[in-house]
């Protein structure tokens, strides 16, 4: 089984400026359609129509929509790893680290919405993409697990499994981001802004780790 850390098989490098512009147009169109319909309902004809290109043009760059998403997954992994560095830097308080973790997850999801939707949906039907999704989720799960262990060293989350807590928090992050960024259209009040969403995630995350039970007298 291939993994996201392996470079996927791809066609020869696009040789001309025109070719690069065409591929960029196809990628942009695919992201637009996938964000709207999801990867499973998206066809190559949909992507070509959105890009204003022929279906044959798509196959000059990708063998299939799955091959396109594999290339995206590699690019996404590199960006996600860079965002993690903001959370791991020294000198942050526990509250600041929770805020940075929420911000990194939100902005990664917003900036790579089509990738997140594509890989998560294909993971339900394809073993390779299930592995890709597991690797993508492992990035935040790993550093949140370490945050839980640090909280336990301070007397919080006693008796809990750090990795299970981290897995639950990442699942919550993913579902929240999906619903806010790709879910049903917002009501009359409109969708919450970025900072409100980040603060909501950070508050839930921080309170989940740094709570103290109050026992009734």
Q: What role is predicted for each listed range?
A:
Residues 18-31, 47-48, 72-80, 84, ...:
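Generic hydrophobic, amphipathic alpha-helix propensity
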Residues 99, 103, 138-149, 163-166, ...:
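An amphipathic alpha-helix signature
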Residues 111-143, 163-164, 191:
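Short secondary-structure transition hinges
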Residues 130, 152-202, 212-217:
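Hydrophobic/aromatic-rich alpha-helical bundle segments in the mid-to-C-terminal region
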